[in-house]
Amino acid sequence: MADVLSVGVNLEAFSQAISAIQALRSSVSRVFDCLKDGMRNKETLEGREKAFIANFQDNLHSVNRDLNELERLSNLVGKPSENHPLHNSGLLSLDPVQDKTPLYSQLLQAYKWSNKLQYHAGLASGLLNQQSLKRSANQMGVSAKRRPKAQPTTLVLPPQYVDDVISRIDRMFPEMSIHLSRPNGTSAMLLVTLGKVLKVIVVMRSLFIDRTIVKGYNESVYTEDGKLDIWSKSSYQVFQKVTDHATTALLHYQLPQMPDVVVRSFMTWLRSYIKLFQAPCQRCGKFLQDGLPPTWRDFRTLEAFHDTCRQ
């Protein structure tokens, strides 16, 4: 703001003019004090009149002198240039009425939003570069000479091998029971019961997990004809949140060449929900936030976080 005011303005004369204004105010105050006190401190009436007139004239001369000095300095101050060095952007340095033109707060909010967007975009880019979102080992590419696509061997594992992997995982976690069924042919469907906390329906394609649905322990997981209900969501918001996080975990645990490791890692992550309603958030230390417990589990440390605290 000082740079804008300094254009065409004598700052030294401006400072002296302020001092002259203070001196003029003092002189005027002395005039009124003289009028207020009147004729005092003299024995005779004639002496009091002469002293009052002399004092009053001195005060008026002081006012006249200070006023002349202020007029002289006002001519030396000069006028600020109407052309701002930054054109219209130079007006931003002025002090607008906050209620009418909240420009500064809006610019600050936009700046914070832009920085946050750039930060999250960088994180998303790094994660997408590390994790492949494709569910197979095939890689996209266009070659000049097309080759016949070979069926990945990891997608056609024998059912006995899948049963053996699921059985070993079931023995790893005593508090988790896994029931395997094949209602639609060779593709397996798992009903995972985690203590008395929740139930998870896992739809598999060989050893690749395609879909997960998390429901409460007391909720029905079967349709009217007795089959596993793989489409309806849970009636509780907390288990809907866990379903969303489980879908995110499927995209995180991706290793097409070793699908058994992927299933074991996912089940280890799922087992961390055994204390869904007992573990506090590792960041805020609270058990509930907006009526929900910490529904997020870190993929590496398995620590509990609220959905908003993990960011």
Curated annotation (Swiss-Prot):
Pfam families: Med27 (PF11571). Keywords: Activator, Methylation, Nucleus, Phosphoprotein, Transcription, Transcription regulation. GO terms for molecular function: transcription coactivator activity; ubiquitin protein ligase activity. It is found in: Nucleus. The modification N6-methyllysine is found at residue 134. GO terms for cellular component: core mediator complex; cytosol; mediator complex; nucleolus; nucleoplasm; nucleus; transcription regulator complex; ubiquitin ligase complex. It comes from the Eukaryota. GO terms for biological process: positive regulation of transcription elongation by RNA polymerase II; positive regulation of transcription initiation by RNA polymerase II; protein ubiquitination; regulation of transcription by RNA polymerase II; RNA polymerase II preinitiation complex assembly; somatic stem cell population maintenance. The modification Phosphoserine is found at residue 132. Component of the Mediator complex, a coactivator involved in the regulated transcription of nearly all RNA polymerase II-dependent genes. Mediator functions as a bridge to convey information from gene-specific regulatory proteins to the basal RNA polymerase II transcription machinery. Mediator is recruited to promoters by direct interactions with regulatory proteins and serves as a scaffold for the assembly of a functional preinitiation complex with RNA polymerase II and the general transcription factors. Belongs to the Mediator complex subunit 27 family. Component of the Mediator complex, which is composed of MED1, MED4, MED6, MED7, MED8, MED9, MED10, MED11, MED12, MED13, MED13L, MED14, MED15, MED16, MED17, MED18, MED19, MED20, MED21, MED22, MED23, MED24, MED25, MED26, MED27, MED29, MED30, MED31, CCNC, CDK8 and CDC2L6/CDK11. The MED12, MED13, CCNC and CDK8 subunits form a distinct module termed the CDK8 module. Mediator containing the CDK8 module is less active than Mediator lacking this module in supporting transcriptional activation. This is Mediator of RNA polymerase II transcription subunit 27. It comes from Mus musculus (Mouse). The lineage of its organism: Eukaryota, Metazoa, Chordata, Craniata, Vertebrata.
